[in-house]
Amino acid sequence: MSQQNTVEGGFDLSSGVSDKKEWVFNLQEVIPTGHKRTVRSVAWSPNGEVLATASFDSTVGLWERIPENIRAEEGSDGPEWECFGTLEGHDSECKSVAFSYNGNLLASCGRDKSVWVWEAQPDADYECIGVLIEHSQDVKCVIWHPKEEILASASYDNTIKMYVDDPSCDWYCYTTLQAHSSTVWSLSFSPCGQFLASSSDDMTIWIWRRVSAAECVELGIQAHGNTPGRSGERWVPTYCIQGHFSGPIFSVNWAPGDSFDPRQALGKLVAAGADGKIIVFFLVRIYATLRGTYACAQSLEDNNPSRIFVHVGAQEENAHGSVDVNCVKWAPMNTDGSAPTMIASAGDDGEIRIWT
């Protein structure tokens, strides 16, 4: 613990009132990555033992934690993290990297318009099992479904691509989502995996709902992604959040953890962008009843809403002064299984701020 960083800031997630809490974070280690250019993205493996870095030098770095007992046996005061691999293949800047929910797969994307899928091997190596060139412009973001091996990517070409593995063939793009009129910067799945949020240069956030194959039949629409052992689905644009931002929305993130409060049946969504705002949205699903009224959804498994109601739970203007806010992330789920109340943000001012 060689340095202390004090990060100030805070707004109440239900009222939006600043509480000026102070959080003290200890800088544990600085990792000299060896990357020759900017490190654009980092991702933890689900077990926290592997760290992946995506760089503008077109490579992905892989780092493993050296167990404390091994370091103690060796009497080493060396680094806690050690590079065990570099993934090469991209022809240009790597923009994003992400692990699958079980850590078996890793995805990377870049300015070369490609998405790469890597698989962890028994010898701790990673093997490329798919190169997907479906976008017509550079790819900004890749994320994995929270419960399945479904991959999504967002691009400068204004689209979102969804990919699955066909056991009889290879990884392929099974559907393209189009609703945005400009670059799609960020994606985030809901904890239940039935909804997807996308944010864009067009100052909107779209909420997409996963429609099952059976429901597709009822609605008279075609399901996508039908493979052996998989019935497929359709991702349908369900709600557009607009009018809250005055510039591109660079980041959107769904709070992990299930909510038992009907008002938060879809949980909390945080977004930030070029106008310096950070906004927390509460998403509520309501159903038409036989009496012509509406009732709240009661659980995350009720995935067929008649309407979605969005409430601004908190908003911070000029969160990083007068500069862009590039990224916002919720803290991991609390130890008691409840959704987190802490948010980290990164801005063009070079600061990381913590909000609660």
Swiss-Prot record:
Q: Which family does the UniProt entry place this protein in?
A: Belongs to the WD repeat CIA1 family.
Repeats (WD): which ranges? 34-73, 89-128, 134-173, 179-218, 244-291, 319-356
**Alphabetical list of HAMAP family matching this protein:** ciao1
- GO biological process annotation, one example: iron-sulfur cluster assembly
Q: What is this protein called?
A: Probable cytosolic iron-sulfur protein assembly protein 1
InterPro entries the record matches = CIAO1/Cia1 (IPR028608), WD40/YVTN_repeat-like_dom_sf (IPR015943), WD40_repeat_dom_sf (IPR036322), WD40_rpt (IPR001680)
Sorted alphabetically, which SMART domains does this protein's record hold?
Answer: WD40
Q: Please name the taxonomic classification of the source.
A: Eukaryota, Fungi, Dikarya, Basidiomycota, Ustilaginomycotina
- Organism the protein comes from: Malassezia globosa (strain ATCC MYA-4612 / CBS 7966)
The organism's place on the tree of life at top rank: Eukaryota
Q: Which keywords does this Swiss-Prot/TrEMBL entry list? A: Repeat, WD repeat
SUPFAM superfamilies per the record?
Answer: WD40 repeat-like
Q: Specify one Pfam family.
A: WD40
GO cellular component assignments: cytosolic [4Fe-4S] assembly targeting complex
The protein's job, in short, is: Essential component of the cytosolic iron-sulfur (Fe/S) protein assembly machinery. Required for the maturation of extramitochondrial Fe/S proteins.
Q: Does the keyword Repeat apply?
A: yes
Transmembrane domains' residue ranges = none
